[in-house]
């Protein structure tokens, strides 16, 4: 996802990650420092172990383009209010990615209600196959550069799946 979204990043643009997240939702965004992105860390409150909206308001800027945040922290166990976070970020046209890998085993995420632009988690965390699942708003997905074979260029939705589908694992979901 970070590779596809880098088209929205110019040198000096900011990406916010949190210190509540799993490394899998931090490293891909940090790699965009190679193209000039500035990574800002939204730190949780040491007393409450929660991300504070007021702290987010203080670090958002006109240069912020992406906010990657966990729905439920595997580090401190708090559940973040993605609806409030998304509403605040969207006021500044910031793309919001919710990492649901630690939330999905405990509840069904309603991505429409959460207001996120993308939501990801690993199906094996919900006793499924070792596959990743990603929800994305179609109006953004359709604008992403091809992540698949070059001959599929421009043929959405095939352009957003790097490689082919894993049929044997997909059938296990039925």
Language-model region placement:
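Pyridoxal 5′-phosphate
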Residues: 1-174
């Amino acid at each position: 996802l970070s590779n596809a979204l880098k088209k929205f990043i110019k040198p000096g643009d900011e990406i916010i990650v949190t210190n509540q997240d799993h490394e899998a939702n931090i490293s891909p965004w940090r790699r965009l420092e190679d193209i000039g992105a500035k990574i800002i860390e939204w730190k949780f409150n040491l007393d409450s172990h929660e991300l504070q909206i007021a702290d987010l308001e203080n670090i958002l800027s006109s240069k912020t383009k992406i906010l990657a945040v966990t729905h439920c922290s595997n580090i401190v166990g708090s559940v973040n209010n993605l609806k409030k976070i998304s509403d605040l970020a969207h006021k500044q046209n910031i793309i919001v990615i919710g990492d649901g890998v630690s939330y999905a085993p405990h509840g069904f995420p309603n991505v429409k209600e959460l207001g996120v632009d993308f939501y990801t988690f690993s199906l094996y965390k919900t006793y499924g196959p070792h596959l990743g699942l990603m929800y994305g708003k179609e109006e953004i997905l359709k604008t992403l550069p091809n992540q698949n074979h070059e001959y599929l260029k421009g043929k959405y939705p095939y352009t957003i799946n790097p490689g082919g589908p894993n049929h044997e694992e997909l059938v296990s979901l039925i």
